[in-house]
Amino acid sequence: MLMPKRTKFRKQMKGRNRGYATRGASLSTGEFALKAVEAGRVNSRQIEAARQALTRHVKRQAKIWIRVFPDKPLTKKPLQTRMGKGKAGVEEWVMNIKPGRILFEMAGVSEELAREALTLAMHKLPFKSKFVTRESENEIY
């Protein structure tokens, strides 16, 4: 499970996920990438499921970079609990994803194999995303 080693505060406010990604919106090291088209939240289980789908499909031939990390605690009250009595405990760790954010990068394989693998990973995520290459990364969403 991906989560921070330590944080300054145990709990955070929910916040709002608006606008487009400015940071993490361009390829840094890989040739091919998975780019978010919609806004959403991704948790550590979804990141791990997508990573496993990628590595199993390319049979460890490619170099894969994970460009997202869940650093926001999400709290949830137990079932059948009355309102009040303070904020609940941390249930899971998530990351807010804005449109345009690069999620995974890949290098060292052909474009067809990378497209197949990143499409498998795409289906593990709770929002729409698309396959991009170095040439096509600056296209409008």
UniProtKB/Swiss-Prot annotation:
InterPro entries from the UniProt entry: Ribosomal_uL16, Ribosomal_uL16_bact-type, Ribosomal_uL16_CS, Ribosomal_uL16_dom, Ribosomal_uL16_sf
Keywords of this entry: Ribonucleoprotein, Ribosomal protein, RNA-binding, rRNA-binding, tRNA-binding
GO BP, sorted A to Z: translation
Biased composition (Basic residues): 1-17
Region called Disordered, residue ranges: 1-22
Pfam families: Ribosomal_L16
Gene Ontology CC annotations of this record: cytosolic large ribosomal subunit
Source superkingdom: Bacteria
GO molecular function, one term: rRNA binding
Gene3D superfamilies with a match to the protein in the record: Ribosomal protein L10e/L16
Protein task: Binds 23S rRNA and is also seen to make contacts with the A and possibly P site tRNAs.
NCBIfam families: rplP_bact
Protein name according to UniProt: Large ribosomal subunit protein uL16
